[in-house]
Amino acid sequence: VIDKLDKSDIYDVIFVVSRFSSLDDIVPIIRNNKSQNIVFVGNNIAVEKYMKLENKNVLFAFFMAAGKKYDGYIKSICLNKIVIGRVDGKNIDDEFIKSIFEKTKIKVTIENKMNDYLKSHACAVLPLVFASYKVNGNLKLLKKDKEYSLLIMDAIIEEYNVLKKLGYEILPKGEYENCINKKNLCAFIYRFMFSNFIGELCISDHAM
């Protein structure tokens, strides 16, 4: 882990782990560095802005973890899974990606339509963010609200439909069909999350 990157610091791959709002400050540093392989990790809904850095092989990734930093410690949950890949549908980096994680315990899913994946993820998250706003971060107030959880599902499906009309694929595969065909089950899962620490760590701590 580094917090400084000079022009002559050469790495096989650089993982950029940062808030989306901080990326514009980091990109000039990345451009100035001579390392070729760059992986932007996180909720990035503006992939188009960062996917064509000159002389760089740019990948995007989403790591299955969430948490919040407190004074002196971090409260977190981590599934040790990562979705990573290109944005153009080509599999030319698959072997390189596998080599990065070869001696780790991280479960890797290679997805070479990461722009579609990250936009799909944003669609799923946004209604949950507004749910947090509705109750000022106390999601337990919604744990028995079946009607509202179904409205969340309606919102997610509506967003997915917009994405599809814009030409994007809803990813991971089967996600759209699950929302349509298992709507009540998905709504129940959200109510379960609202009732415990999962909702706090994965939703409200990020939203508020």
Identify the residue ranges that each predicted region occupies.
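C-terminal helical cap and adjacent loop that interface with cofactors, partners, or active-site loops
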Residues: 198-208
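Rossmann-fold dinucleotide-binding core
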Residues: 45-121, 126-127
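Rossmann-like NAD(P)(H) cofactor-binding subdomain of soluble oxidoreductases
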Residues: 2-74
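Small-residue-rich helix-loop
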Residues: 147-198
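N-terminal glycine-rich dinucleotide-binding loop that anchors FAD/FMN and/or NAD(P) in oxidoreductases
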Residues: 1-2, 125
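Soluble, non-transmembrane catalytic domains of enzymes that act on hydrophobic metabolites at membranes
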Residues: 25, 78, 90-102, 138, ...
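A short secondary-structure junction motif
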Residues: 104, 130-134, 200
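Active-site-proximal catalytic alpha-helix in oxidoreductases
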Residues: 115-143, 147-160
